[in-house]
């Protein structure tokens, strides 16, 4: 509901967009304020059982813009309508101190960070992949679950985990991915890669290949070059 109301307020920017002379700004305005966009962002159209499938708290699903279940449900609606690239952000994982309680990030929350974050993410991802499969669009939709770096395997002096780029995992589903396999392995503590290290370049090449693009081909756009 908040998303729909926010989009309705974009009407105040109509004159600015039309008088700017910026074609990209005008196009972005038309896209955001279109009836198709408004319909896509209206999660109230979804049956209650679908919202419950995505969220640990279906009531919060329509109110909290940071709710991972709501975001994944919205992602599915956008994909259904032909949006080619959708990003879902799940925040709250940067816990450098006191992992035993989540209250340092959310006052009043007595759960540990893992108990506060993992169940919702787990349910949302499972719901998204299952829902895409039920609608026969998983095979044409690549789902990528990743972060920019991992966390230190050892707890630091303040009871948290710091940034750790040496070893972490990425999950992929749909889009032609052969499921049911794990590529590479870490040592016993999860500190370093023990077998088949995968680089960012390897990951990018896999994504390009699944999208039907040749990762070895260099492409240059001259559209904005003078």
Where in this protein do the model-derived segments appear?
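Ligand-binding pockets and gating/stacking loops
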Residues: 1-225
């Amino acid at each position: 509901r908040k998303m729909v109301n926010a989009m309705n307020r974009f009407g105040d920017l109509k004159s600015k967009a039309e008088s700017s002379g910026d074609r990209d700004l005008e196009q972005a305005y038309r896209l955001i304020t279109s009836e198709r966009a408004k319909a896509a962002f209206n999660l109230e159209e979804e049956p209650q059982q679908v919202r419950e499938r995505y969220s640990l708290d279906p009531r919060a699903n329509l109110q909290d813009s940071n709710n991972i279940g709501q975001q994944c449900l919205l992602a599915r609606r956008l994909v259904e309508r032909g949006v080619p690239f959708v990003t879902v952000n799940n925040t709250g994982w940067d816990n450098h101190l006191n992992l035993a309680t989540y209250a340092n990030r959310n006052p009043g929350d007595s759960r540990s960070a893992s108990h506060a974050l993992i169940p919702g993410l787990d349910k949302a991802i499972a719901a998204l992949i299952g829902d895409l499969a039920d609608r026969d669009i998983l095979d044409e939709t690549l789902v990528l679950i990743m972060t920019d770096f991992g966390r230190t395997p050892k707890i630091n002096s303040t009871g948290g985990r710091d940034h750790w780029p040496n070893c972490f995992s990425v999950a992929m589903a749909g889009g032609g991915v052969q499921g049911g396999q794990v590529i590479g392995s870490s040592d016993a503590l999860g500190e370093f890669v023990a077998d088949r290290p995968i680089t960012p370049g390897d990951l990018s090449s896999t994504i390009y290949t699944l999208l039907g693009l040749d990762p070895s081909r260099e492409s240059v756009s001259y559209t904005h070059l003078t």
